[in-house]
Amino acid sequence: MATDTYGVGYNSNTIEGRYNQYARNRELFLERGRECTQYTIPTLIPEEGHSATSRYYTPFQGIGARGVNNLASKLLLTLLPPNAPFFRFSIDNFILKDMEGDENLKTEIDRGLVEVEKAVMEDIEISSDRVALFECLKHLIVGGNCLLFVSKEGLRVFPLDRYVCKRDPMGNVLEIITKETININVLPENIREVIYKTNKPEDIGDKTCDLYTCVKRIKNKFEVIQEVKGVEIPESAGSYPVDKTPYMALRMIRVDGENYGRSYCEEYLGDLKSLENLTKAIVEGSSASAKTLFLISPNGTTRARALAQSENGAIIEGNASDVSVLQVSKFADFRVAQETMAKIEQRLSYAFLLNASVIRDSERTTAEEVKMTAEELQASLGGIYGILSQEFQLPFVRRKIAILEKGGRLPKLPKNVVRPKIVTGLEALGRGNDRNRLVQFLQTLAGTLGQETIGQYVNVSEAIVRLATADGIEVKGLIKSPEELQAEVEQQQRQQLEMEQAQAVTSAGENIASNIPPKTVGETLKHMQQS
């Protein structure tokens, strides 16, 4: 028996004991997340012991909440774009070499993989995965950590205060323990009997108990077991391959050697705090300045009661110099605070990709400037795309495929032959840079050497395919193949030849007719009719 930082005893041999032990390492990250949520969305990571009747802090500024929701929406549209696949299946290079001589086989395999991609995307479209992922992304932005459970029913989100995890030095997950509060009546009957025998009635309380789920990596599998009141539930035991586990412990920003990640808001916490304090000062100062008070000289002839009870436009006795209005006279101070707020808001707008707030307010702002600003902001998320593609997108696709294969809705794909490849996020940023370089190269070539140089030296078909690929457009059936182009050229040549032959025949007939005398022509026609 050991004791944690709060003086609560725990048994490290039980799942609950290990949870309490790991929770000590999590506390620093949890406190930091709660500090960030105070200036963004206070209900996201509430204080310990909160309930439905808890009162939450209301921030004086709303740019934190607006920025979190905006950034989460942009990440959601990038990670799971609607009506568009975010992954492609790629075939092993050695297998591709074996199929080089058989184009029909390669085409058939590509067609089958496209059907599998459509089936996976259709399952995602009809599910509520995006709703849960949006909540998860907000937790990642504010708290830096979140746990996703992917089942056939959909996604489930575990905030940082409901799970602990342990990683190896490379960042791979070794153990995850979740904590849930459930009604004891949902447990199997044999487990309920053991709990009632091993625990006092007052320990069970209002028939709710904490359910602990342990997910531990053993070699190439994750072993799962659940525990209630120190009693393991045999029916919950199971195992998953490492690459198909339903438990995904996500991080926003990876820090080497730490079990948990850092949040996006933590990097801008100073600006959020400063903006909150300045906004609070200006709001409270403005409220004080808006209060109107009339001062009456105690030695004057004007009566305060007569002034207070008089109606608008009334005539009363008094001296105007006896009456004055109380003013705060803090306009200059408020102006300095307002200018500082504007600079902080602009910095936060860049950080949270609030494009409309960072566009230069000018009549000469061009569409190209707006586009370049948006691309610059999007490129700043390259590191976040990188970690989310490896820790969420790839495991999510593998898990979805495993669920569909187990349900008989997908054929079993050959292992180590066909692999999913992410085509959004960081990959899309790379394709966008390739597109910009290609367009710039073609423009430079045309402007320096002339338009005819492109048609003479550049493979136009390949350039068109690369531009379409960079924009994520499927070229199959859209761009004409070399065979189709060759057939069109041959058809045009045949039509041109037929037109030339027809013109030659017509021209020859006209020449013959023009060289025969009219009388001879008539006789010739008559002879032709008789014959």
Model-derived features: where do they sit?
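Short, mixed-charge, low-aromatic patches
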Residues: N69-L79, R88-I95, E103-K106, I225-P234, ...
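Short, hydrophobic/amphipathic alpha-helical patches that form generic packing surfaces
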Residues: K74-P82, L269-G285, Q443, E462-T469
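Structured, contiguous alpha/beta core segments that scaffold functional sites
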Residues: N11, N20, V142, V150-S310
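Long, contiguous amphipathic alpha-helices that act as assembly "spine/axial" helices in icosahedral shell
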Residues: R34-Y39, V68, D110-K152, Y260-L295, ...
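Extended, helix-rich architectural segments
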Residues: M1-V194
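Charged, low-complexity surface segments at secondary-structure and domain boundaries
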Residues: D4-T5, Y57-F60, I91-D110, E117-E125, ...
